[in-house]
Amino acid sequence: RNETLKREQPFVMSVPASEADPSYPEDETILVQGIIDAWFPEGDEIVLVDYKTDRVKEAGELKKRYEKQLAYYQQALERTTGKKVKEKIIYALALDEELVL
């Protein structure tokens, strides 16, 4: 299925500060940095995978907690690769379950 699995890819990108917190002025920017657990190209698009070790009762809780984080990961990958992220997957290790966002 995958062509090349990329792991632990660090990134730093500039985003409007108001995107992180609406109380910031529109013209200010902040740096967002992180490490993307895994991703792979699938055709002309990308599948993003994030592993979570949180102990939760259901995977849906992880969606609420990490939706914004994965949106930043998506933005970083799309900027650096020029490809569209077609799927974001959170893999809940404690539940042995995947959640597609």
Task: Annotate each predicted stretch with a short phrase.
Residues 1-101:
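Structural signature of nuclease core domains in nucleic-acid processing machines
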